[in-house]
Amino acid sequence: MLNTFKKVTASYLSAAYILIRETMRYKCNYCTYNEYIKNLALNFSRENIFFIKFFQAVCTTSHPLLTDDVSQYLNTFTDNAPYTDSEIDVESLERLMQEYSIEIKTPFVPIKSGAISLIFEGTLTSEKEKESVIIKCKRVGIDDKIQDAIFNMNHLISFTKIVPHIKNLNVHDIYNENKQSIVDQLSFHIEVRNIELFYSKWSKPGLDYIKIPKVYSEITQQIPNVIVMERIVGNTIYNIDPEDKDRYANLLAKFNFKSVFYDSVYHGDIHPGNVFFIKELKTKSHASIDDDDDSNDDSNDDSSDNNDSNNSNDTNPDMNNNNNNDFKKYRYKLGIIDFGIVGKFSREMQNTIFHLFKGLYEKNHDVVAHCIIDNLVEPKDALTNEKKNELIGIISKYSENHFGKETHRFLDAEDIIKINKILYGFGVQFSKEFCKIELSFAISDSVCKLLTNKTTYIDQLLTIFSKYS
């Protein structure tokens, strides 16, 4: 007990020291504001890797203290987390080179550094060809670091239940419901199965606008600390042409629509580093095929997945309805990577999200309120009929004030925080199942906002929704 107390106290004191030191440096003009925030992110992540996810979620909210430079830094921070040479699993990488004819540049230098893994480039040589591959390799000692991080965060998060202004943000439940997702990322066997699942959903005719990497599962079976997969080449979200954003927003909307309402799964970590934006110049043969596809009906979509659908729709979203000259010239695709966090919807949750989205689209604010109160809050028996009706009225009014304007939008991170404050005042909060989805929505929101141009991501999603709802 004494050792536990010392360990937790040491962790808190270290975090406090980092905060005080960096704040004093900023106040004494030793660094700019942007450098101050970046230094906090860097040093806190070294103290506890859960802070990486925290900073990732923070940048999904609009706040005057978050400058564009800081927001972009935090958005890309998960791909550039600090690491040391001792965390490179040299033994596994050398086995990979010796046993599977994979060339990796030495000395081993990662091209990206995530919280759990280091990413390397390589070339897989077979009898037929050479293929560029990506090697995802677990950091040495990361399992123990994750367990230590969970141990320390468990105590820190417990305090959020009693701190004013924080206790009603549902931080405790969001953390508890998502920490298992972090632990699951330690098992590359789980991630390989997730990649294969999404690959099977998107490697069918008519769905090639989404590129999922092919994974070499047999390698992970023999070397469990590595994943070898096809390399996807594309631009980052910060390097795409502004005029192309609407195209990509449309593709992302189709990806999420099909995943949620047809496949009953969702990618739990759609941050800017996990999406590649591909723009290919069409060949004559491709152009003629795609021109024909423009007039295709829904029969070209992934109808085989409809048997797994949990909603009443029986047609997948059409993927080629764009007819301007630029579309005729180029093929647009999204490359989706990193399937360490994948969630599955229950039938009830899938239907709830469908009706919630439909209520927001139709601006039926009573439906929105009933969806939230009847299906997304707990404990179920905490509300009397009188209190329930009162709360439904308040949420309906909130929906009218925030979603009743001409522009359409869905619940974002700030809405969830505000609504949860209202719920907390009535002795209820968002359900644990919804908490699993809540953080994923917040993280993906950063990508959606960055794709806003002439239209928004939500506008694109609503266009698809109106066609198939």
Write out the residue ranges for each language-model feature.
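Catalytic-loop of the protein kinase fold
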Residues: 265-272
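Broad phosphate/nucleotide-binding scaffolds in NTP-utilizing and phosphate-metabolizing enzymes
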Residues: 1-257, 264, 277-288, 325-347, ...
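Long, acidic low-complexity intrinsically disordered regions
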Residues: 289-322
